[in-house]
């Protein structure tokens, strides 16, 4: 059991060393684009499925509430959290449309629409990002593996290069926390 723990921790360390080496410019770009959008009065729409839905909800909560510093609220909406909307849209339009329909209702040009997908291939995230691009939104992805089919729909894609879903999710939440910190410092420090 202890060997398994050590192996898993070494694997995580290697991934975080890779993130530390390759992703700081991408995280800085993500934060800068969010800061610009918030300064212009735009909002963040964020979505994902399963654990990525939890990450989307977590990110929206940090942006609307606060991350580390007391400050004014910023506009962010998780498209993964309203069970009535999700089940109505899933029932009436199919699960592939649950995020797209919300983007249709809520997104305006200049908004940031962020899709979180450990596979990079979630059809409902892909469909929503496609519509967001057509509407003049900035599209971003927090993705895993090789970025999948969603990568090409993103103006900015941060890809955690692992095949292990829990490890990808750990990378995503770390990136989310760093970006939240950068956004707060840029807008309120």
From Swiss-Prot:
Domain SIS positions: 34-189
UniProt keyword annotation of Transcription regulation present: no
Cofactors that this protein relies on: Zn(2+)
GO BP annotations listed: carbohydrate metabolic process; D-glycero-D-manno-heptose 7-phosphate biosynthetic process
EC number: 5.3.1.28
PROSITE patterns in the record: SIS (PS51464)
Catalytic activity: 2 D-sedoheptulose 7-phosphate = D-glycero-alpha-D-manno-heptose 7-phosphate + D-glycero-beta-D-manno-heptose 7-phosphate
Gene Ontology terms for molecular function: carbohydrate derivative binding; D-sedoheptulose 7-phosphate isomerase activity; zinc ion binding
InterPro entries the record matches: GmhA/DiaA, Phosphoheptose_Isoase, SIS_dom, SIS_dom_sf, SIS_GmhA/DiaA_subfam
Residues annotated for substrate binding in this entry: 49-51, 62, 91-92, 117-119, 122, 169
UniProt remark on cofactor binding: Binds 1 zinc ion per subunit.
UniProt-annotated location(s): Cytoplasm
GO cellular component, one term: cytoplasm
List of residues binding Zn(2+): 58, 62, 169, 177
Pathway: Carbohydrate biosynthesis; D-glycero-D-manno-heptose 7-phosphate biosynthesis; D-glycero-alpha-D-manno-heptose 7-phosphate and D-glycero-beta-D-manno-heptose 7-phosphate from sedoheptulose 7-phosphate: step 1/1
Keywords annotated in UniProt: Carbohydrate metabolism, Cytoplasm, Isomerase, Metal-binding, Zinc
Extra facts: The reaction produces a racemic mixture of D-glycero-alpha-D-manno-heptose 7-phosphate and D-glycero-beta-D-manno-heptose 7-phosphate.
Family: Belongs to the SIS family. GmhA subfamily.
Function per UniProt: Catalyzes the isomerization of sedoheptulose 7-phosphate in D-glycero-D-manno-heptose 7-phosphate.
Quaternary structure and partners: Homotetramer.
The protein, known as: Phosphoheptose isomerase
Name of the gene this protein is made from: gmhA
